[in-house]
């Protein structure tokens, strides 16, 4: 009974394989099956003169730091891989750290000098600003006084116009008075100018 079942199991996979046909997805097209409708204009193009290809050829190649460790690369087990010396890497890192420390000190020194200079400039600007404010207040007072002078000048001009209109009337009125009651001729000039 057990031998019959094992013989049946062995014969079944062969029967399945013989009846199954390969799927069309697995069937690959051959070059004879491809029909080219039009060749196109790419055939006449010269690849060696293509600027993109020239730029790609000018790119330098780079090798990894540890050779033999590229992805997908298989190396024999007995091949000795190149390794970085830890002491040299440590010395490189310490030297780089020292360089960064020196740069940081130089930047901090320059930064402190700039902060000090900025504070000095702020103090100078504040002093200058207060001085200019005081000067502006003084000039505002001067402007008020000049405005008052202008107002007084306008008032004096109006007074002068009134006097110029009044003096002829006084002369006319004085000429109408009798000889004994007439006044001296009215004049706005000082006595010294009249005597000269």
Swiss-Prot record:
It is found in: Lysosome membrane. Keywords: Lipoprotein, Lysosome, Membrane, Myristate, Phosphoprotein. GO terms for cellular component: axon; BORC complex; cytoplasmic side of lysosomal membrane; intracellular membrane-bounded organelle; membrane; plasma membrane; synaptic vesicle membrane. Residues 1-32 are annotated as: Disordered. The modification Phosphoserine is found at residues 71, 75. Residues 1-22 have a biased composition (Polar residues). Belongs to the BORCS5 family. As part of the BORC complex may play a role in lysosomes movement and localization at the cell periphery. Associated with the cytosolic face of lysosomes, the BORC complex may recruit ARL8B and couple lysosomes to microtubule plus-end-directed kinesin motor. Thereby, it may indirectly play a role in cell spreading and motility. Changing residue 2 to A: Loss of myristoylation and loss of localization to lysosomal membranes. Myristoylation at Gly-2 mediates attachment to lysosome membranes. Ubiquitously expressed (at protein level). It is a lipid-anchor. The gene is BORCS5. It holds the Pfam family LOH1CR12. A lipid is attached at residue 2 (N-myristoyl glycine). Component of the BLOC-one-related complex (BORC) which is composed of BLOC1S1, BLOC1S2, BORCS5, BORCS6, BORCS7, BORCS8, KXD1 and SNAPIN. Interacts with ARL8B, KIF5A, KLC1 and PLEKHM2; links the lysosomal BORC complex to the microtubule plus-end-directed kinesin motor. This is BLOC-1-related complex subunit 5. It comes from the Eukaryota. The lineage of its organism: Eukaryota, Metazoa, Chordata, Craniata, Vertebrata. PANTHER family: BLOC-1-RELATED COMPLEX SUBUNIT 5 (PTHR31634:SF2). One of its GO terms (biological process) is regulation of lysosome size.
């Amino acid at each position: 009974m057990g031998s019959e079942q094992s013989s049946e199991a062995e014969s079944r996979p062969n029967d399945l394989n013989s009846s199954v046909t390969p799927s069309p997805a697995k069937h690959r097209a051959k070059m004879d099956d491809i029909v080219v409708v039009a060749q196109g204009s790419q055939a006449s193009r010269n690849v060696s003169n293509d600027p993109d290809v020239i730029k790609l050829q000018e790119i330098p190649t780079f090798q990894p730091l540890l050779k033999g460790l590229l992805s997908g690369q298989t190396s024999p087990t007995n091949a000795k891989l190149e390794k970085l010396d830890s002491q040299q890497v440590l010395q490189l890192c310490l030297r780089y750290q020292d360089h960064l420390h020196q740069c940081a000190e130089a930047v901090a020194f320059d930064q402190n000098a700039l902060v000090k200079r900025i504070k000095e400039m702020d103090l100078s600007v504040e002093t200058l600003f207060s001085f200019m404010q005081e000067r502006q207040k003084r000039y505002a007072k001067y402007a008020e006084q000049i405005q008052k002078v202008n107002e007084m000048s306008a008032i004096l001009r109006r007074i002068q116009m009134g006097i110029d209109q009044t003096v002829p009337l006084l002369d006319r009125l004085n000429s109408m008075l009798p000889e004994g009651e007439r006044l001296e001729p009215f004049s706005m000039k000082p006595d010294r100018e009249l005597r000269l």
